Amino acid sequence: VGLKLIDNGKHPACLLDAENLANGIYFCITKDVAHNQTYFFMDDWNISWKQYFTDLAAMKGKTIGSSIPFWLAYFVASVAEIAFPLVGKNPPLAKKSVKATGTNRTISTQKARTELGWKSEVNYDESMRRIKESLN
């Protein structure tokens, strides 16, 4: 069956490269202004789930499957989460995954950018290059 996009993969992929996260954590530890504060980190790549999954699949010479609407994916996940454990198996689709890729989950990183001076140092192309390298 393969990977199916939810709502054509139109929603933003809320991605965060590990190095960019590490930089954010470093700023939280080393900057006094961060004491007792909460910050959100998310790369500003403006990449859709469709592009991200297409790029990942291409690394392995694969293509992504068709798309299903959010409501159908959520319904299937809801049923699977009940039915599969009854036969001792993990469901192939989870409601949490459907929500993560089938809705807009972007967050504001303005506070981290303003107060900590944080930004995405590693860009999308470099992050994808690193992922591809790790797969080989």
Predicted segments with their positions:
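Mid/C-terminal beta-alpha module of Rossmann-like enzyme folds, strongest
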Residues: 27-92, 129-130
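Glycine-rich Rossmann NAD(P)(H)-binding loop
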Residues: 6-11, 39-46, 57-60, 101-103, ...
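Substrate-positioning beta->alpha
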Residues: 7-29, 36-37
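Residue-level signal for the nucleotide or nucleotide-sugar donor/cofactor binding architecture
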Residues: 13-19, 47, 107, 122
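Amphipathic terminal alpha-helices
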Residues: 107-115, 119-136
